[in-house]
């Protein structure tokens, strides 16, 4: 618990330190990025480097806050999540982008006229939106689980697997990917136990796979954890049986943070994997609402930090291309009006030049 408290204190300290006064540009921003994690900051970085006016609004609640380090990210493996984000914010600001601490309450309007309203009633206008708010991991309602999250209660073998290698690992069945999750963790330890929990024990091919890999399947509902000296030491079943374990893997229900988009008709839907809900997007990151893109865990629940950052950059590039197209169409329309209007200032100047010739300056 002390580790979680320390992490929370560090996050709050950053969040309050980042409460800055942002003076909105006269015509609003080209893009408001909602969410200041890896996807949002990398997207903002791309947009700022493309000379777009961009504002990042960050609620300061990153999904990976309980983790001690980010893993699987080249040249940054093991870096504390808060430190990585601090570097990202500095890079965005270095190119003229703005980062603001705040929580979005609602979004209204449409492309070229979105209004993003915060919970403290501040409001910002944007031509386009990039949604990178991530997701919330909803854990099973088992006493003690949330206090161990990100420590000895883990979910991703690629994010946390190395740290629990060769330990006594348990896998709590909570969804359709439970057997697959157990097989992945078997790669990291020869001592893996599969807890069926409220589901029926595996049968058929699934049972055969577990047996072939030496994974013991334990029936019965899990009632709680056994923690000794702030370390997980066992999993307690409802009948009182305790199975010694030092790490427990669980698949949470992953829920996209997207409720604030209801005002523009954009809502999260069930993910095809059955693991939670997400915002669906096309191959470019575009949502079904014109002018709105999304990237990172809000649309791809399984994305790690590197994947999320890459998705943010790619969506930002597509978004910038869309703005370039809009700017060009507006410029062409203005150009056509100018050359087609015989009484425009440009045409009158041209007529004067043709009539007066070289004497026009002396008239």
PLM-predicted stretches and their roles:
Residues 23-24, 29-83, 167-168, 177-200, ...:
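Beta1-alpha1 glycine-rich phosphate/pyrophosphate-binding loop at the start
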Residues 35, 132-134, 141, 172, ...:
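Short, well-ordered coil/turn residues at beta-beta hairpins
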Residues 4, 9-31, 99-167, 247, ...:
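FAD-binding core/adjacent interface of flavoenzyme oxidoreductases
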């Amino acid at each position: 618990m002390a580790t979680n408290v320390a992490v929370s204190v560090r996050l709050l300290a950053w969040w309050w330190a980042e409460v800055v006064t942002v003076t909105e540009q006269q015509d609003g921003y080209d893009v408001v990025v909602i969410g200041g994690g890896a996807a949002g900051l990398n997207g903002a970085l791309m947009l700022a480097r493309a000379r777009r006016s961009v504002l990042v609004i960050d609620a300061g609640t990153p999904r990976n806050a309980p983790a001690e380090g980010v893993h699987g990210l080249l040249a940054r493996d093991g870096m504390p999540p808060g430190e990585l984000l601090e570097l990202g914010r500095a890079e965005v600001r270095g190119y003229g982008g703005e980062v603001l601490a705040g929580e979005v309450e609602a979004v209204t309007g449409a492309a070229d006229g979105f209004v993003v309203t915060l919970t403290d009633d501040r409001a910002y206008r944007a031509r386009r939106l990039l949604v990178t708010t991530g997701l919330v991991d909803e854990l099973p309602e088992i006493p003690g689980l949330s206090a161990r999250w990100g420590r000895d209660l883990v979910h991703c073998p690629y994010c946390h697997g190395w740290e629990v290698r060769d330990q006594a690992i348990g896998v709590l069945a909570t969804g359709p990917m439970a057997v697959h999750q157990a097989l992945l963790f078997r790669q990291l330890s020869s001592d893996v136990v599969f807890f069926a929990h409220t589901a029926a024990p595996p049968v058929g091919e699934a049972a055969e796979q577990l047996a072939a890999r030496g994974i013991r399947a334990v029936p019965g509902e899990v009632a709680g954890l056994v923690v000794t000296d702030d370390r997980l030491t066992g999993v307690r079943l409802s009948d009182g049986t305790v199975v010694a374990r030092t790490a427990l893997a669980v698949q949470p229900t992953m829920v996209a943070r997207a409720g604030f988009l209801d005002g523009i008709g954009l809502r999260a839907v069930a993910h095809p994997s059955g693991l939670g809900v997400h915002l669906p997007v096309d191959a470019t990151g575009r949502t079904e609402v014109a002018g709105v893109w999304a990237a990172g865990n809000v649309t791809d629940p399984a994305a790690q930090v590197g994947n999320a950052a890459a998705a943010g950059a790619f969506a930002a590039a597509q978004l910038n291309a869309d703005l370039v197209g809009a700017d060009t169409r507006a410029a062409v329309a203005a150009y056509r009006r100018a050359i087609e209007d015989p009484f425009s200032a440009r045409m009158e100047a041209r007529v004067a030049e043709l009539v007066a010739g070289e004497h026009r300056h002396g008239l």
